[in-house]
């Protein structure tokens, strides 16, 4: 008899039971690992699968996390073969060519489209009913690419979008007012990145409109220069990349925030990237961030946000820029 047989007596033969809320992270780079640890520490799934083409790096990261299993409640698996991702509830795609210092997100695009042509069909093969969350940049275009390549309905393909931009915005407003970001309600919509749109008309604390107190807020004529806060949001990622070489922690936490709303069916409103054709005067098939309700089925509803004419014009301009790139893509 083996030690195990001496220690344990079987009462019944267990039938293999699949995971109820499995999450997969594709890509074990800085963003993938920050997303993985954020998901693990929030205890969001009973199984976390990780997949990447770089076998040694993947194996090392998975082992490193598994060594912490005592402190977690989640089974951690990893392989370069996508069969390890089978029956995932949510698949988070962080893989792709990394943005170089000074490189615009749009510049990355065709490099990443080619990577997606391998990734997306594999996800669909093993998790045909999953909710697909795209994090790789440029996120709005790649969410469109993932939607096209997957054949999924639009409510099951979500881009992480401006969830992080809005978090940065709320943090900076909070710094200026000496308040916690959760008490500063503010939204950034449109493109994740350089042409994102701050909705100054909606910024409020405890229901008090800040633009009601300072009608010039967000304009050139504002003596308090609130506009600089949005510039800081846009420059924030470039600044972090310049200082440490990449961004990871905040986007990882943002991803876990979105995964939580889906897995726990919270019906929470997030600014995420979705198909906005027909909204805010957008005519083309583009994905941009607007406030959306996230739950177990994915993206269930879109909130009709009241935008001022100038804000709406900026959203349309973003859409035109993205469509200009998208129509050149070889899918």
UniProtKB/Swiss-Prot annotation:
Superkingdom field: Eukaryota
Lineage, uppermost ranks: Eukaryota, Metazoa, Chordata, Craniata, Vertebrata
Subcellular localization: Cytoplasm
Protein name: L-lactate dehydrogenase A chain
GO cellular component: cytoplasm
Residues that coordinate or bind substrate: 105, 137, 168, 247
Gene source species: Gobionotothen gibberifrons
Binding locations of NAD(+): 29-57, 98, 137
UniProt cross-references to Pfam families, sorted A to Z: Ldh_1_C, Ldh_1_N
Catalytic activity: (S)-lactate + NAD(+) = pyruvate + NADH + H(+)
Cytoplasm among keywords: yes
PROSITE patterns in the record: L_LDH
Keyword Oxidoreductase among UniProt keywords: yes
Record pathway: Fermentation; pyruvate fermentation to lactate; (S)-lactate from pyruvate: step 1/1
